[in-house]
């Protein structure tokens, strides 16, 4: 199992660096381009959600990122310093916010949201 874990500032360059490092590990484990794309999309959506909505782009606020990569699955977990997500307000695809979470929910095998922590689990089939 590979574990990629990092606490980063709410900064686009830090986010890009973490995402690139995580994707390199993911690509080494899985050669299925569709699966890798799905994981990239999940990673991007969850971290950008923390950047934009959770931490409101405030640089000093932290984003905790954890990616667990195993032969059978990948888990992406993100925690920010925001107030949390009201998942019930994310059901409308035409709403101003919530499309990213709805997308992640649709392509994940399991999505768990608890206040300001969100985790997506995807099994490799």
Predicted regions and their residues:
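Conserved beta-strand-loop-beta-strand hairpin that lines the nucleotide-binding pocket
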Residues: 1-4, 51-125
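Residues in soluble alpha-helical coiled-coils and helical-bundle/repeat scaffolds
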Residues: 13, 30-31, 112
């Amino acid at each position: 199992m590979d574990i990629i874990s990092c606490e980063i500032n709410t900064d686009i360059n830090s986010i890009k660096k973490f995402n690139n490092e995580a994707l390199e590990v993911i690509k080494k484990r899985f050669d299925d381009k569709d699966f890798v794309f799905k994981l990239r999309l999940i990673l991007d959506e969850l971290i950008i959600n923390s950047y934009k909505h959770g931490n409101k782009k405030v640089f000093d606020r932290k984003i905790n990122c954890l990616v667990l990569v195993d032969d059978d699955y990948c888990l992406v977990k993100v925690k920010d310093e925001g107030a949390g997500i009201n998942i019930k307000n994310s059901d409308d695809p035409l709403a101003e916010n919530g499309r990213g979470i709805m997308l992640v929910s649709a392509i994940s095998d399991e999505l768990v949201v608890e206040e300001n922590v969100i985790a997506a689990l995807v099994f490799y089939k």
